[in-house]
Amino acid sequence: MAKVCHTTQKHPHGQRSLSPLQYNALLPYGAILQEGGSNRADGVQFVVFSRHATALRVLLYDTPEDIEPAEVISFDPKTDRWGDVWTVFIPGLKHGQLYHFQADGPFDASAGHRFDPTARLVDPYSKALAGHFLHHEDGIIRPPKSIVIDDHFDWQGDRHLRHELADTIIYELHIRGFTASPSSGVAHPGTYLGVIEKIPYLKSLGVTAVELMPIHEFPQESYAGHRRDHENYWGYDPIAFFAPHQGYSASTEPGRQVTELKQMVRALHAADIEVILDVVLNHTAEGSGDGPTFSMKGLENSVYYMLENDSGDYRNFSGCGNTLNANHPITSELICHCLRHWVHTYHIDGFRFDLASILSRDRDGILHKNPPLIESITEDPLLADTKLIAEAWDAAGAYQVGTFASSRWAEWNGRYRDDVRRYWRGDDNQTGNLATRLAGSSDLYAGEQRQPYHSVNFITSHDGFTLNDLVSYNQKHNEANNEDNQDGDNNNYSYNYGIEGSTEDAHLTAIRGKQIRNMLSTLFLSQGVPMLVAGDECHRTQQGNNNAYCQDNAISWFDWNLPVVNADLLEFTKTLIRLRRNNPTLRRRTFLQGGSSECGVIPDVEWFSPDGSHVDWFSGEPSLICFFGAPTVDQLTAEDDPAGTPQHVLLFCNAATEARQFLFPSSPVILEMNWSIAVDTRQSHNTIPAAAPLKFESSRPVMLPERSLLCLMAPTTSTFGK
């Protein structure tokens, strides 16, 4: 039987000589407003927001497995409430203390109130959770317990790396999926520590940042929307925004995930690799009206969620049953505190915001022109050096690619993904679109003080086909998700080249391999910031599943045999990354202006048709020559001297289904350059640059077989290196 104590009474954790009001009066005002359970010198301060609660309690537990609390402490509404903030100091408690909140109040769904006095509630400001969701025969769900954490850690001088966004190469990975396979050979598979063991691989690949799929705490099974009772492998149904996922800890000790995540970040930073978090700040795992109550819904539903004005039903812009009321001052404050927490406590370098357009919506779901939350994040001084990347759309039709927020924000460029896929698939009239994407997507980002690096270029992401499957399947194959193959996107711009799925056919395998190399080459030779998905460098497959959100198995896991079996593609990818990192011409800080080399000057970009003449964008020709002129010394200086040796770039692309004869551009400026082959997808593997420069003549054609790419580079006299 739990012991219930009022805060004005003595209790087992320490004898009070002061009233609760006197205790709170001794604390700095900022401490009172620091929500959550905070360690103090001689106890723990609990702070929680609720506007309409009539009573609040903190339930204290001894172990994560406890069904009933060891003690229940009631807040005194007369002395422990400051406006809508409830706060109580309990002496004698210390870090490691487990707790829930419990709140009394009205249940009136039409008015937005869903208080349940029996519900055990996770603290929205929990810094860590312990235990699992417990299901009782009566249908009640008990969530994990919140933990008062010990925040001490020896960072050994670690600081944020602050790589320039324009120089960033992102690698998207799932903490568990990266090392869960037995083939990983790590001591701690599927964990933060497992990632540490694979840092040499990341370092050899050459990426500068890892973008981690959600690591904030989430239930292992989904309670949201139509996906209820499915495995929540991806983690896009959060329950505690501030808390690292305990399932990724190698230790079962409560709170140990805090230390292990810090160890991982410290180790990645030591390898000069930044850490970007994919944060889901648009909904929670509490689902819709018939979903469970285990946190915000039971504390202040009417504030935290977007609700229909007449019925109190949940607005569903996330596709997951509910939507955070992100621009309400209380919710906005929580989100900003959350981001600061990750930056300050874990040294996180940046964030990718899932369904970021939701963060621009007001309580009625209307898109703000100047959303208060976005402005708060943009102007937050602690986030000033933090990378901000928006997935600039949502599940209700908002699409803000190219128009999201301000110059502080980069964006996942969905147009880049679609246009590159369509060009190399051979769709009609895609050459102009390819050129626009190669040059940094000025059609999307040339305004609002933006530059090419505001475009995060990707061809695949966790959400959709892998690169291998993009050239192996015409349709999605999500039967393993048990949703009758109704989930996942139907519009993938994929092509199997004759046989659906895997094949031993050598000719077909060669075509698919070439198309993968074509798209990888395009990605790393484009202006903007490239993002590679873990495994695309070595033919990882999901067997045609383009929505593997619930597949915690070999469908999703990284198979560590692949880098060995497909070492040629891995080395090809490493070469592309090395070429990009060594050549500032591919990492321009400003948009290209164009020009003509026939005038005797070197333009920053020039476009040619296969016959060597200037391109006719309306011809429907599926082949293209692109010239990127190297930046001048003055331009490099103005761009803060990016690392590497600037080289001119000449790119030949042939998406046609037959061989094409390309004439070298006749401009003397281009002809006289000392060209060497840098990338050649005509071969079955990457061609290393020739030892001696190659001489080309305008009258001698360059032959490109069907669906192939050739990239030449020529040196200048300017060398920069940081």
Language model regions located:
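Carbohydrate-interacting/catalytic domains
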Residues: 1-171, 176, 197, 202, ...
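Short, flexible loop/turn elements at secondary-structure junctions
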Residues: 50-52, 79, 92-94, 105, ...
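Short, solvent-exposed loop/turn segments at the edges of secondary structure
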Residues: 83, 96, 166-168, 234-239, ...
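Core domains of carbohydrate- and sulfate-ester-processing enzymes
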Residues: 103-158, 220-237, 271, 291-315, ...
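Short catalytic/ligand-binding loop motif for oxyanion handling, primarily in non-cytosolic enzymes
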Residues: 108-112, 179-181, 218-222, 283-286, ...
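Conserved alpha/beta catalytic core and glycan-binding cleft of carbohydrate-active enzymes
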Residues: 126, 347, 360-363, 368-534, ...
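Hydrophobic faces of well-ordered beta-strands that scaffold small-molecule active sites
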Residues: 169-171, 210, 275-277, 351, ...
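Substrate-binding/active-site clefts of carbohydrate-active enzymes
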Residues: 174-193, 197-348, 355-382, 398, ...
